[in-house]
């Protein structure tokens, strides 16, 4: 097949990695995103990248954009540090202990980075303006042996040779493609916020400011997670200096602050928690930590009062994925996981780069599309579901996450 048109539902990190890969291969691609703009919803804050994610970005981006990514990514000390509620170190775990499932890196490419998620997404969006359609909520698709058509809530449709569901944990593509695939409540809830790094410098130790991530647990298994994002060059300045194809929003250095645990600890229903304002969530985080030392409670107390948001955590249940000739899935659409190992976004981007390589083989005549999808899905579900299970086991052990149904 010398010509191929790929439809991607979802403009998250995995779908954008795939799109960037396909542009480099000169494969026609169109992206459909349900949000009305890149900034419709909170994009989250710090993201830890391991060699899976970094390799995928390296393979997918053109050199100028990879240079911009590197210039705006923190290279932390590669440890996840376990501390007590007073932030005294109990042990430091090398990040590679739960790192890449790919096990290889390009020479000279770091194996661990802390990045600002919104900055990374903006870099991945660069150059996609002509193929990205916002406000397109996919409802279903129709496929036959020769093509697939994506149907949208606004009554429009798009036709291509392949549809990729990169549309997240509530994937409409997955509901039709793998209707027996299930997602379940992990039982874990969290409040995310951040504080300026200048404030954090007076509140936390050097290790907290330099390690990949730091986590404290109390007797109730309430946890406090802390992760720095220190830009080698501020994103907007890096973009102006390196003259890439687009601008980046300014963002100062910060420390992410996550307070989480079993949903019963929060004392409110999810609907009420979701309706709380940022300032109310900040106050709730302090009430949750009422038994913690005052010096540690000062960390969320000094957070930006407009930065706090609530997250419910769900996970996929590993299952058999039947073969399809022209519809596939990537990332959270098929193997969503709790963030206990920090692997979800890394694997979504790995999926995108892997699928891109297989589709490159299709247009070069090395294999047909059905073979490419079969090989991609076999590899992707093997490593993806393996990490889903490991993340659930770690969550159960550390914070009391619900076990996966097959393990209960």
What are these regions (language model features)?
Residues 41-45, 273, 340-343, 367:
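Short, solvent-exposed loop/turn segments at secondary-structure boundaries
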Residues 88-116, 192-304:
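Conserved FAD/dinucleotide-binding core of flavoprotein oxidoreductases
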Residues 42, 61, 177, 341, ...:
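Short, flexible helix/strand-to-coil boundary loops that buttress conserved ligand/catalytic motifs
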Residues 14, 37, 170:
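Conserved Rossmann-like nucleotide-cofactor binding loop
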Residues 2-4, 66-74, 79-99, 298, ...:
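C-terminal helical "tail/cap" subdomain of flavin- and related membrane-associated enzymes
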Residues 2-6, 50-177, 181-196, 267, ...:
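Conserved N-terminal helical subregion
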Residues 36-56:
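Conserved N-terminal glycine-rich FAD pyrophosphate-binding loop of Rossmann-like flavoproteins
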């Amino acid at each position: 097949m010398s010509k191929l048109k790929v439809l991607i539902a979802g403009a998250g990190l995995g779908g954008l990695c795939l799109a960037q890969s396909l542009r480099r291969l000169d494969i026609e691609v169109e992206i459909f995103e349900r949000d009305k703009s890149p900034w419709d919803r909170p994009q989250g804050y710090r993201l830890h990248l391991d060699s899976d994610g970094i390799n995928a970005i390296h393979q997918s981006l053109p050199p100028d954009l990879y240079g911009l990514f590197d210039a705006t990514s923190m290279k932390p000390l590669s440890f996840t540090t376990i501390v007590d509620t007073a932030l005294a170190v109990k042990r430091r775990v090398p990040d590679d202990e739960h790192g890449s499932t790919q096990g290889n890196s390009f020479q000279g490419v770091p194996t661990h980075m802390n990045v600002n998620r919104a900055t990374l997404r903006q870099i991945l969006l660069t150059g996609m303006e002509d193929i990205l359609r916002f406000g397109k909520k996919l409802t279903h698709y129709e496929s036959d042996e020769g093509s697939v058509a994506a149907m949208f809530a606004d009554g429009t449709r798009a036709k291509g040779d392949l549809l990729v569901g990169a549309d997240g944990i509530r994937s409409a593509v997955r509901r039709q493609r793998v209707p027996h695939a299930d997602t379940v409540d992990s039982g874990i809830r969290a409040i995310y916020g951040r504080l300026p790094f200048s404030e954090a410098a007076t509140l936390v130790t050097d290790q907290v400011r330099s390690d990949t991530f730091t986590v404290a647990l109390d007797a109730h298994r309430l946890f406090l997670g802390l992760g720095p994002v220190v830009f080698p060059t501020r994103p907007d300045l890096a973009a102006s200096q390196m003259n890439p194809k687009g601008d980046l929003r300014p963002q100062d250095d910060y420390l992410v602050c996550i307070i989480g645990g079993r949903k019963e600890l929060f004392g409110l229903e999810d609907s009420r928690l979701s309706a709380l304002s940022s300032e109310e969530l900040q106050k709730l985080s302090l009430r949750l930590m009422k038994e913690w030392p005052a010096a540690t409670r000062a960390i969320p107390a000094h957070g930006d009062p407009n930065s706090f948001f609530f997250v419910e955590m769900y996970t996929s249940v590993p299952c058999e994925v039947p073969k399809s000739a022209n519809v596939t899935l990537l990332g959270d659409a098929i193997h969503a996981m709790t963030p206990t190992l920090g692997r979800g976004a890394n694997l979504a981007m790995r999926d995108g780069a892997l699928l891109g390589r297989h589709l490159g083989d299709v247009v070069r005549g090395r294999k047909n599309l059905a073979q490419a999808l079969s090989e991609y899905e076999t590899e992707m579900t093997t490593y993806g579901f393996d990490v889903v299970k490991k993340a659930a086991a770690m969550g159960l052990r550390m914070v009391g996450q619900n076990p996966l149904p097959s393990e209960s």
